[in-house]
Amino acid sequence: MAKQIQAIRGMNDCLPTQSALWQKVEGTIKQVVSAYGYNEIRMPIVESTHLFKRAIGEVTDVVEKEMYTFEDRNGDSLTLRPEGTAGCVRAGIQNGLLYNQEQRLWYIGPMFRYERPQKGRYRQFHQVGVEVFGLNGPDVDAELIMMTARLWRELGINQHVRLELNSIGSLDARATYREALIAFLEQHLEVLDEDCKRRMHTNPLRVLDTKNPAVQEILVDAPKLSEYLDDDSKAHFAGLCELLDAAGIEYQVNERLVRGLDYYNRTVFEWITESLGAQGTVCGGGRYDGLVEQLGGKATPAVGFAMGVERLVLLMETLELADVRRSVDAYVVTVGEGTMMAGMKLAEKLRENVPGLRVMNHFGGGNFKKQFKRADNVGAAIALVLGENEIADNTVVVKDLRGGEQTTMAQDEVTAKLAELI
């Protein structure tokens, strides 16, 4: 026997037993973003490596250690996208969507990062992104946060997530703060681990979100970024907080929240859960007003967020909220000469007249017992039984597979009966 080929580590199959919950989560997300008037955009999975180096930052963990990068046959360096914002901005610039325009976009699809696989963190993961271009006020920042809050309510997880936000100011303000932070960290080198020492000179703000308890302890006395903010960033953040207060959205200001990508400025936020252990961030985003210009477009304000579908699915499973509609509503059982095609015609008629009804025909023969067992296995609520007598009388036996009751009715009446299931 030939050796079995396994899936790549950290890249998982989504099996039929899981896909119904995925469809529920993805469908709910699409309904919510559409309710705000946002339009879908679809970008390639593979982009030029230079795009991510320029957008995310060459000294970030993503670019240095986590990207799947390769050369094609022309010698061009290509990368499987590790996130969606850079590609969305590239598409907007290339297709003339951004200059002097307002765009509200969303996308969904697989992303790739070479990380150590663990619960809630995978090498291929599915991300939903929402991006707004051309608006620079705190009102659109607030709308995005309100959108995520609505999504949590729709999914039933709103009591299990909390919002943290911060302002990291302008590039100039951060540059001044960066020097002050480095000076502080240099006074505590004996406490810093190797990762923090490396970040101290490449991306010192990332030291603020370290998980090392000893480093966290000294950071209590570190300079505060809020004390270095420019006046415009302070006013923008105050306006955002005022709007969230008016909307009744609870939040916590976390002055150590900086996000992991270099393109952010001003607003940054995360939705966090305590139910998934170390992988507690279910959604993160912020403002990136300089990225469009950085990637070759005209200066355009922008803000957005992203969330991982796997993590949302895992959270719903953990909270036992994974109740989804069965995959089959009615199962057609046929026994006797000439009954197969009659059963298929009945199923087609029901699909046409009852939108959303899921009807499965039995194939492969077998007696009633075998077919009813199969109907149970697929989770059908009702069996529709057609034998030679039913075809002669133009009737059908409708059996409730949950309660066991059954009744015989004219085939023309079955449509109304099954419509009650939807």
Curated annotation (Swiss-Prot):
Entry annotated with the keyword ATP-binding: yes
Source species, domain of life: Bacteria
Cited PROSITE patterns: AA_TRNA_LIGASE_II
Keyword Chaperone: no
EC number: 6.1.1.21
GO aspect biological process, one term: histidyl-tRNA aminoacylation
Catalytic activity field: tRNA(His) + L-histidine + ATP = L-histidyl-tRNA(His) + AMP + diphosphate + H(+)
Subcellular location: Cytoplasm
GO cellular component, one term: cytoplasm
UniProt main location, coarse: cytoplasm
GO molecular function: ATP binding; histidine-tRNA ligase activity
A Pfam family this chain is assigned to: HGTP_anticodon
Keyword vocabulary terms for this entry: Aminoacyl-tRNA synthetase, ATP-binding, Cytoplasm, Ligase, Nucleotide-binding, Protein biosynthesis
Gene3D superfamilies: Anticodon-binding domain (3.40.50.800), Bira Bifunctional Protein, Domain 2 (3.30.930.10)
Name of the top EC class for this enzyme: ligase
InterPro entries given in the database record: aa-tRNA-synth_II (IPR006195), aa-tRNA-synth_II/BPL/LPL (IPR045864), Anticodon-bd (IPR004154), Anticodon-bd_dom_sf (IPR036621), His-tRNA-ligase (IPR015807), HisRS-like_core (IPR041715), HisRS/HisZ (IPR004516), HisRS_anticodon (IPR033656)
SUPFAM superfamilies: Class II aaRS ABD-related, Class II aaRS and biotin synthetases
Quaternary state and interactors: Homodimer.
HAMAP family: His_tRNA_synth
Similarity comment: Belongs to the class-II aminoacyl-tRNA synthetase family.
Annotated protein name in UniProt: Histidine--tRNA ligase
Source species of the chain: Photobacterium profundum (strain SS9)
Taxonomic placement: Bacteria, Pseudomonadati, Pseudomonadota, Gammaproteobacteria, Vibrionales
